[in-house]
A protein has these predicted regions:
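Class I SAM-dependent transferase core
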Residues: 1-24, 29, 63-66, 70-71, ...
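Conserved S-adenosyl-L-methionine
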Residues: 32
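Conserved SAM-binding loop of SAM-dependent methyltransferases across substrates and taxa
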Residues: 35-47
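Short beta-strand element of Class I
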Residues: 48-52
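Conserved acidic E/D residue at the C-terminus of a beta-strand in Rossmann-like folds
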Residues: 54-55, 102-104
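S-adenosyl-L-methionine
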Residues: 54-95
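A short, conserved alpha-helix within the catalytic core of class I
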Residues: 108-116
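C-terminal substrate-binding/active-site "lid" region of AdoMet-derived donor-dependent transferases
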Residues: 116-177
Length: 184
């Protein structure tokens, strides 16, 4: 795999944070954290959260730690490892059962990773999954429903102003599709 992806667009970050309905305290997992932007912003908004950020790509943990220092926040754990393997073993102290999960990674193992997350998700917990395709939605939504979670699907599209010779036009950005499950 290549270097960590760039920061998620601000419109996507805002939608994902809103979907997480961040509590004042609790445990947040950011799996497939990339640069850590969403988890670190959540920690900045809710400093009492315990954040576990996981990114498997080489250099990912160092980048997340550097971004955390820049934002003056302290994640509980930043790990450069495969999230599915991590969840199959022992997790760092106090982080074994999340209240909120942002599942941004998983690649071809995303279905197995979601199953592992659902086994550890606390009652009233929320999992939010950004999706690039409707096929991914068709694959993952039934897992949330079969586990008895309340499911929401959202799509948001933003437009940004682009200069024209005599004004500004609105250029559409790719839509942002999210799948959210809330455990009862």
């Amino acid at each position: 795999p290549g270097p960590p992806v760039l920061l998620a667009r601000r419109e996507a970050r805002a939608q994902l944070r809103a979907g997480l309905a961040l509590p004042d305290r609790g445990r947040l997992w950011d799996l497939g954290a990339g640069t850590g932007s969403i988890g670190l912003e959540a920690l900045r908004l809710r400093p009492q959260l315990k954040l576990l950020a996981v990114e498997r790509r080489a250099g990912g943990a160092a980048l997340i730690q550097a971004n955390a220092a820049r934002l003056a926040v302290k994640p509980s754990a930043v790990l450069e490892t495969d999230a599915l393997q991590l969840l199959a073993g022992d997790l760092p102290d106090g982080l074994a059962q999340p209240d909120r999960v942002l599942l941004g990674g998983g690649g071809p193992n995303r279905e197995a990773l979601l199953r592992a997350v659902l086994q550890r998700l606390r009652p009233s917990g929320i999992v939010v999954i950004p999706l690039a395709t409707v096929e991914a939605l068709a694959l993952l939504r039934p897992l949330l429903e079969q586990a008895g979670l309340t499911v929401q699907v959202n799509q948001v599209q933003a437009w940004r102003g682009q200069p024209l010779s005599d004004g500004t036009r609105l250029a559409p950005m790719n839509p942002i599709l999210t799948l959210k499950g809330t455990k009862s």
